[in-house]
Swiss-Prot record:
Its main location: mitochondrion. The keyword Mitochondrion applies. Component of the cytochrome c oxidase (complex IV, CIV), a multisubunit enzyme composed of a catalytic core of 3 subunits and several supernumerary subunits. The complex exists as a monomer or a dimer and forms supercomplexes (SCs) in the inner mitochondrial membrane with ubiquinol-cytochrome c oxidoreductase (cytochrome b-c1 complex, complex III, CIII). It is an enzyme of class 7 (translocase). The lineage of its organism: Eukaryota, Metazoa, Echinodermata, Eleutherozoa, Asterozoa. GO terms for biological process: electron transport coupled proton transport; mitochondrial electron transport, cytochrome c to oxygen. It comes from the Eukaryota. This is Cytochrome c oxidase subunit 1. The gene is COI.
Length: 517
């Protein structure tokens, strides 16, 4: 019974739980890799003896965190659990395809670990640029295994996207029109379109790389009339929407959490928030070459990508100010999820500001491939996506599990994590401005101080992760009954009779009525 329940599940709650558990495990693997990176960089001199090994760990860290931690948790975990509940659907549109979406992920993860384990590993960076990833510079099977891993993860995401799009369009209960869709549902809906449009481009790029490596095509080899810059265009046409895929569901979760703990029935400027989500989704496809300001583009091309990149700051700013306005005039309940959400807004804004700086192509030429860029994207990921995940997790955990988290330990976890990530990544701005390049395992002595500070910060984050595991253990062993939250009338997912809602949510389809205030 248990075997068939978890292996052959067609239930959105069980599949969501599988995604959450898998994402937590992958997150621990990715965190372990990041600690290895920071240990190597804690002092000058070599620890791992070899830049190839170092770059293999950097590559695996990035791919694990993106494809096996953030996306499975945000889209697979929260998306599966909450979207059917929020729109009053009995389940997802294609329950068996939903199951396949999940079970493509563990084999993909194993292939990625295999790529690091065979030969000398794939030390290409997560971007897998040729000619470094070519058959010449990376002989052996490592890069091929990484390519197959990405194919499986991509197939999984495409299937999941089809499922979410169909579910949201066709399975809303009467009364939930598109202009009343909860913001988290909107964000995953837009994210699904981004995945559906960008992943096939990545699949094409890495398939061409695969044939370049194995069957003597020359898509990316100038000797046969190819161009390595083509790969960069194809990769970043996927890669830039991908970073919005990683953050948009987080935006949706933060909107729910802030409105909830501010005691508001909805976030400030709901319709503007929806348009902002959609605008970010569209603009995300029009700015990819800002990752390539140093490859020798025309000045007018650079001018366009600079301007277009800055325009993305407008809908993002609308969202940040709407979150601030939601807090205005409210009697806040200072529960752990609100702390994570406020931390998100503050730190994501800092990450966004460094993004506006990097959008200037003239400045980016200097800062490209320095730790300034590392600091920028870790502020929006390590403190954006991850804080959003913890905000959502601490907020909805009683709904998922039926038990309550310990409030004091939750606040301790937040405090440790907040100190840890800021201590890790803020000094990296200084390193970048001082010219320290990325993807090297060693550095001149002049950079020692801030690298040591950064590595101390990563140790604090590691301790915070262990505290989180303790919090989970404590919650399940103490079995505190989860109560219906006070201000829950605005969100359909809290309206069901028990926590967690029964295996099959409904006996019959609900109908929602909105009171005109």
């Amino acid at each position: 019974m248990q075997l068939s329940r978890w292996f052959f599940s067609t239930n959105h709650k069980d599949i969501g739980t599988l995604y959450l558990i898998f994402g937590a495990w992958a997150g621990m693997a990715g965190t372990a890799m990041s600690v290895i990176i920071r240990t190597e960089l804690a002092q000058p001199g070599s620890l791992l003896q070899d830049d190839q090994i170092y770059n293999v760990i950097v590559t695996a860290h990035a791919l694990v965190m993106i494809f096996f931690m953030v996306m499975p948790i945000m889209i697979g975990g929260f998306g599966n659990w909450l979207i059917p509940l929020m729109i009053g659907a009995p389940d997802m549109a294609f329950p068996r395809m939903n199951n396949m979406s999940f079970w493509l992920i563990p084999p993909s993860f194993l292939l990625l670990l295999a790529s690091a384990g065979v030969e000398s590993g794939a030390g290409t960076g997560w971007t897998i640029y040729p000619p470094l990833s070519s058959g010449l510079a990376h002989a052996g099977g490592s890069v091929d295994l990484a390519i197959f891993s990405l194919h499986l993860a991509g197939a999984s995401s495409i299937l999941a996207s089809i499922n979410f799009i169909t579910t949201v369009i066709n399975m809303r209960t009467p009364g939930i029109s598109f202009d009343r869709l909860p913001l988290f549902v909107w964000s995953v809906f837009v994210t699904a379109f981004l995945l559906l449009l960008s992943l096939p481009v990545l699949a094409g790029a890495i398939t061409m790389l695969l044939t370049d490596r194995n069957v003597n095509t020359t898509f990316f080899d100038p000797a046969g009339g190819g161009d390595p810059i083509l790969f960069q265009h194809l990769f970043w046409f996927f890669g830039h929407p991908e970073v919005y895929i990683l953050i948009l569901p987080g935006f949706g979760m933060i909107s729910h959490v802030i409105a909830h703990y501010a005691g508001k029935s909805e976030p400030f400027g709901y319709l503007g928030m929806v348009y902002a989500i959609v605008s970010i989704g569209i603009l995300g496809f029009l700015v990819w070459a800002h990752h390539m300001f140093t490859v020798g583009m025309d000045v007018d091309t650079r001018a366009y990508f600079t301007a277009a990149t800055m325009i993305i700051a407008v809908p993002t700013g609308i969202k940040v100010f709407s979150w601030m306005a939601t807090l205005q005039g409210s009697n806040l309940r200072w529960d752990t999820p609100l702390l994570w959400a406020l931390g998100f807004v503050f730190l994501f804004t800092i990450g966004g500001l460094t993004g506006v700086i990097l959008a200037n192509s003239s400045i980016d030429v200097i800062l490209h491939d320095t730790y300034y860029v590392v600091a920028h994207f870790h502020y929006v990921l390590s403190m954006g996506a991850v804080f959003a995940i913890f905000a959502g997790f601490t907020h909805w955990f009683p709904l998922f599990s039926g038990v309550g988290l310990h409030p004091l330990w939750g606040n301790i976890h937040f405090t440790l994590m907040f100190i840890g990530v800021n201590l890790t990544f803020f000094p990296q701005h200084f390193l970048g401005l001082a010219g320290m390049p990325r993807r090297y395992s060693d550095y001149p002595d002049a950079y020692t101080l801030w690298n040591t500070v950064s590595s101390i910060g990563s140790t604090i984050s590691l301790i915070a992760t262990l505290v989180f595991l303790f919090i989970l253990w404590e919650a399940f062993t103490s079995q505190r009954t989860a109560l219906q939250p006070e201000f829950s009338t605005s969100s359909l997912e809290w309206q069901y009779s028990s926590f967690p809602p029964s295996h099959h949510t409904f006996d019959e389809i609900p109908s929602t009525v909105y009171l005109i205030k």
